[in-house]
């Protein structure tokens, strides 16, 4: 093994957390060999973990999914029943393509172009490879003034760059016919940047890898990872298109070259334009996101066009539960969304009794918000949610409707307590808009953990109306308690109140009146009698 060339199959570069909570750096081969001993990937960013997970999945697809499966769930179940991954088959594949996994190579460097050169002969600092956006929940930018990074770090950020790189003008590459004036003009962000990425997570990394390995799909022999393709050049590949998830997992949106210094670290880089992707037509290929019907794109192409569904970082994941777990497409009342295939696959496994029907599916989502023209980083965020596996099934329409209604009632209750906060501020002579926003945020915060717990406990096989009624009562009590706190803190000015004239109409705002409005709205939004809990079939 030539360590100076750094083969990612056998050299450690992937950050993981073991079952005891310790972080380790492992090679690709060791990860597959010991996946059952690792809890999860533990890279610098959730988006980095997502990008690396997809590379690992590309390997597994090529090992186990070389042709259509006659009995997809049964064949998958045979692998699931093992305590570890079938390492012999995996190693055989890795050894076959070993020469394509050298990070530094004169002819075929991993995910790079060996002779990539800028038209001006210059290179860029290596920190261009690393996002300069705030980490969710953190105070500092990811990017620092790196003079160099280790090959292991470079390998991680190389995978991230292909998946998520920002758009904007790139360095013009010699041999790229699209270059004008030494510049590569924008061709869009990396493919994963379009996605509200979804990962089904297991109790360890072995389970996570398998749960995201969808055997029930049409196999296309052209669907191969980039390391099985001819070595990349600086030029755009002619007529390049994805033929399945494997190609998308390793799509070369950029042409990249890492430059080593005398110590063997990476100190300079080139990032140039690669292959653009037809982002409007990937719903039959991409398996790790949900989909939304795009009216503008459908009008443009004269057919239904589904675009990757993205997540709103300002909202908790459960507030969009109707899009995350849509009802069947055959239901014309809700054909605006299509389910995420990896979530649906878990439901298929449960319906075929490969997984328990009581299994709680846990998902982790990853999203990126870009700046203007997608030419800068804004935010990278993630969220988690757990629910009964059967909620992803097309057969669970009635249960889904109950969950939708539960989320809607929670959201409306938060909005109602927000209006209470605004009305109390008006009564006290304060800023109603600011107070309303703060109270609404408090409402959502108060309901967040309880809703997640309720959803994890929700069972489609039990009485959904009883479960909805219990949740509605819980929301009522939590929001009523929050309202009591707001009223107690409103101050004497609010109790006295004031008259406010708007549009030639005068209304008296006071604590007492605000409470009356609040109570009326809350009772209307949260019906608690048994007759009003019923969900239509």
Residue ranges and their predicted role:
Residues 150-153, 272:
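Short Cys/His-rich metal-coordination motifs, predominantly Zn2+-binding knuckles/fingers
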Residues 142-145:
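Flanking scaffold residues of small Cys/His-coordinated metal-binding clusters
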Residues 1-136, 160, 165-537:
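Extended alpha-helical scaffolding segments
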């Amino acid at each position: 093994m030539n360590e100076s060339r750094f083969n990612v199959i056998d050299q450690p570069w992937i950050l993981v957390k073991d079952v005891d909570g310790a972080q380790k750096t492992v090679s690709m081969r060791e990860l597959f060999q010991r996946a059952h001993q690792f809890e999860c990937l533990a890279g610098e960013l959730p988006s980095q973990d997502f990008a690396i997970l997809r590379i690992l999945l590309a390997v597994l697809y090529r090992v186990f999914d070389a042709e259509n499966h006659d009995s997809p769930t049964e064949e998958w179940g045979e692998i699931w029943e093992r305590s570890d991954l079938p390492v012999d088959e995996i190693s055989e594949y890795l050894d076959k393509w070993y020469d394509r996994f050298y990070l530094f190579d004169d002819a075929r460097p991993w995910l790079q172009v060996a002779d990539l050169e800028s038209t001006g002969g210059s290179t860029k600092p290596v920190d261009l490879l690393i996002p300069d956006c705030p980490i969710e929940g953190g105070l500092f930018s990811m990017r620092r003034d790196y003079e160099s990074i280790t090959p292991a770090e470079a390998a991680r950020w190389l995978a991230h760059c292909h998946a998520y790189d920002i758009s904007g003008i790139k360095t013009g590459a010699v041999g790229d016919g699209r270059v004008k004036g030494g510049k590569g003009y924008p061709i869009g962000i990396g493919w994963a940047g379009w996605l509200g990425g979804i990962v089904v997570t297991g109790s360890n990394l072995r389970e996570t890898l398998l749960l995201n390995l969808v055997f029930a799909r049409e196999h296309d022999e052209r669907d191969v990872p980039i390391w099985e393709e001819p070595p990349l050049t600086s030029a755009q590949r002619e007529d390049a298109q994805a033929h399945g998830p494997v190609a998308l997992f390793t799509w070369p949106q950029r042409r990249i070259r890492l430059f080593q210094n005398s110590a063997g670290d990476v100190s300079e880089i080139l990032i140039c334009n690669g292959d653009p992707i037809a982002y409007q037509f990937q719903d039959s290929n991409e398996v790790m996101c949900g989909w939304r019907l795009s009216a503008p794109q459908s009008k443009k192409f004269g057919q239904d066009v589904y675009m990757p569904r993205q997540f709103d970082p300002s909202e908790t994941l459960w507030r969009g539960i109707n899009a995350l777990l849509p009802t069947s497409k055959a239901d014309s009342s809700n054909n605006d969304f299509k389910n995420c295939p990896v979530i649906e696959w878990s439901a298929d496994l449960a319906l075929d009794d490969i997984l328990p029907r009581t299994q709680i599916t846990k998902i982790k989502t990853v999203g990126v918000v870009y700046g203007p023209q997608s030419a800068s980083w804004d935010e990278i965020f993630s969220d988690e949610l757990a629910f009964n596996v059967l909620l992803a099934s097309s057969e669970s329409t009635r249960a889904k409707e109950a969950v939708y209604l539960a989320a809607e009632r929670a959201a409306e209750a938060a909005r109602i307590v927000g209006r209470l906060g605004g009305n109390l501020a008006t009564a006290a002579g304060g800023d109603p808009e600011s107070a309303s926003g703060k109270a609404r945020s408090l409402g959502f915060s108060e309901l967040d953990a309880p809703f997640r717990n309720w959803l994890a406990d929700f069972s489609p096989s039990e009485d959904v109306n009883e479960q909805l009624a219990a949740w509605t009562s819980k929301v009522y009590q939590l929001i009523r308690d929050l309202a009591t706190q707001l009223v107690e803190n409103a101050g004497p000015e609010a109790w006295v109140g004031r008259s406010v004239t708007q549009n030639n109409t005068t209304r008296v705002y006071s604590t007492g009146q605000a409470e009356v409005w609040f109570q009326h709205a809350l009772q209307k939004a949260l019906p608690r009698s048994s007759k009003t809990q019923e969900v239509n079939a």
